[in-house]
């Protein structure tokens, strides 16, 4: 699916991560059982070093409120002027009601501000931006997009294959109506591979072997039960390496934007080696493809792209391509124009006493 919008702009982005910081080197004994070779390999190939993890009492709404309040104050936005609050997450505070409605209360928003969730993972920022642009194209004026996860809650802390890979973080993005600003999106999904990245148990469906295409996800281990995240890492890597470059080429062709006019190509930061492989396949310049979020924050799911935008030293006006791939399986790319983008250094959330 490809589409174009011309009425919306991204005015600002803030990202909040929890205060508990973990360094992978400190987990040599507790997580890696003194397997120094595996630890060094994960650091080198995936690009891991540090990550931030929520405690049991910190959820998406807490980080989202922190990021949102900082963003709205920084942009001097009246909360009553917001038309919609969208929360994109796969780790909601509650099954019911939506995290957006709960956050609506925490932010003390007007009853005229509609609030709803979108269930998306690593590609979620693109899906959230797509919906926000659609709503503004139809007449809305200001939309607050909250995007991110606390996936560490679904992973046993001693699972050395997954625990070091995922960090927690939530972004807040303000999208506003403007006179003219082109934005191009390309999105896709393939549900045949729904079980390649999945939490089998915990919702309404009872997990049974005949539901899944992948028999191995029903095989539990000491540090992975059915309530924990399962990832077929090899297949996810291969499919991402196929889908993201294809999506990137399609969005460039659809937008008719010359690659030379794009300042940054931002790929979901799930694996430093994967980003390097995509960059090489597409023959992109190193200085246009930042690849450092894994080292500082690990895989932030839907929050990785907004984190990149906050961490980059961007000019006053620039074009960027954004691409992501994740659970669903779902993926997408966009070519966006930015002007006077408001960002702050990554915020550290401290639990209110």
Curated annotation (Swiss-Prot):
| Subcellular location field | Cytoplasm
SUPFAM superfamilies this protein is in? Thiolase-like (SSF53901)
Main site of residence? cytoplasm
**Which reaction equation describes what this protein catalyses?**
malonyl-[ACP] + acetyl-CoA + H(+) = 3-oxobutanoyl-[ACP] + CO2 + CoA
* Classification via Pfam families: ACP_syn_III, ACP_syn_III_C
Keywords for this protein:
Acyltransferase, Cytoplasm, Fatty acid biosynthesis, Fatty acid metabolism, Lipid biosynthesis, Lipid metabolism, Multifunctional enzyme, Transferase
Tell me the disulfide pairings in this chain. none
Molecular function, one GO term: beta-ketoacyl-acyl-carrier-protein synthase III activity
User: Which GO terms of type biological process are on file?
Assistant: fatty acid biosynthetic process; secondary metabolite biosynthetic process
So where's the catalytic machinery, residue-wise?
A: 122, 268, 299
> Gene3D superfamilies, alphabetically?
3.40.47.10
Query: What EC number(s) does the entry state?
Result: 2.3.1.180
Named in its record, the pathway it takes part in is: Lipid metabolism; fatty acid biosynthesis
Question: Can you list the GO cellular component terms from the UniProt entry?
Answer: cytoplasm
Per UniProt, the enzyme's principal EC class comes to transferase
Purpose of the protein = May catalyze the condensation reaction of fatty acid synthesis by the addition to an acyl acceptor of two carbons from malonyl-ACP.
Q: Its quaternary structure?
A: Homodimer.
Family named by the database record: Belongs to the thiolase-like superfamily. FabH family.
Q: Provide the protein name.
A: Putative 3-oxoacyl-[acyl-carrier-protein] synthase 3
User: What organism is the protein native to?
Assistant: Campylobacter jejuni subsp. jejuni serotype O:2 (strain ATCC 700819 / NCTC 11168)
């Amino acid at each position: 699916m490809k589409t174009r919008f011309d009425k919306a702009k991204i005015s600002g982005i803030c990202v909040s991560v929890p205060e508990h910081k973990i360094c992978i080197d400190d987990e040599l004994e507790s997580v890696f059982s003194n397997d120094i070779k595996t630890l060094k390999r994960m650091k080198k190939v995936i690009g891991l070093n540090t990550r931030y993890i929520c405690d049991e009492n910190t959820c998406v709404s807490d980080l989202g409120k922190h990021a949102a309040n900082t963003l709205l104050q920084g942009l001097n936005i009246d909360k009553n002027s917001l038309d919609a609050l969208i929360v994109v997450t796969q780790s909601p505070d509650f099954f019911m009601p939506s995290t957006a409605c709960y956050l609506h209360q925490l932010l003390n928003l007007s009853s005229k501000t509609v609030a709803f969730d979108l269930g998306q993972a690593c590609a979620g920022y693109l899906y959230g931006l797509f919906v926000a642009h659609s709503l503004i194209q139809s007449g809305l004026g200001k939309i607050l997009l909250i995007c991110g996860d606390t996936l560490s809650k679904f992973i046993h802390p001693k699972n050395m294959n997954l625990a070091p890979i995922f960090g927690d973080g939530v972004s807040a993005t303000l999208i506003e109506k403007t006179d003219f600003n082109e934005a191009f999106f390309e999105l896709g999904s393939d549900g045949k591979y729904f079980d390649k990245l999945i939490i089998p148990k915990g919702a309404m469906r009872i997990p049974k072997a005949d539901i899944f295409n992948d028999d191995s996800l029903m095989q539990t281990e000491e540090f992975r039960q059915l309530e924990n995240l399962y990832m077929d890492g090899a297949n996810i890597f291969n499919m991402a390496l196929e889908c993201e470059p294809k999506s990137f080429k399609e969005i460039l062709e659809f937008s008719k934007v010359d690659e030379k006019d794009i300042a940054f190509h931002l790929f979901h930061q799930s694996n430093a080696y994967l980003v390097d492989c995509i960059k090489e396949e597409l023959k992109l310049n190193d200085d246009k493809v930042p690849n450092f979020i894994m080292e500082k924050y690990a895989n932030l799911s839907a929050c990785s792209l907004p984190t990149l935008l906050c961490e980059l030293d961007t000019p006053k006006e620039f074009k960027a391509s954004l691409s992501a791939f994740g659970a669903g399986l779902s993926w997408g790319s966009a070519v966006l124009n930015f002007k006077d983008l408001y960002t702050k250094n990554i915020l550290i959330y401290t639990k209110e006493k």
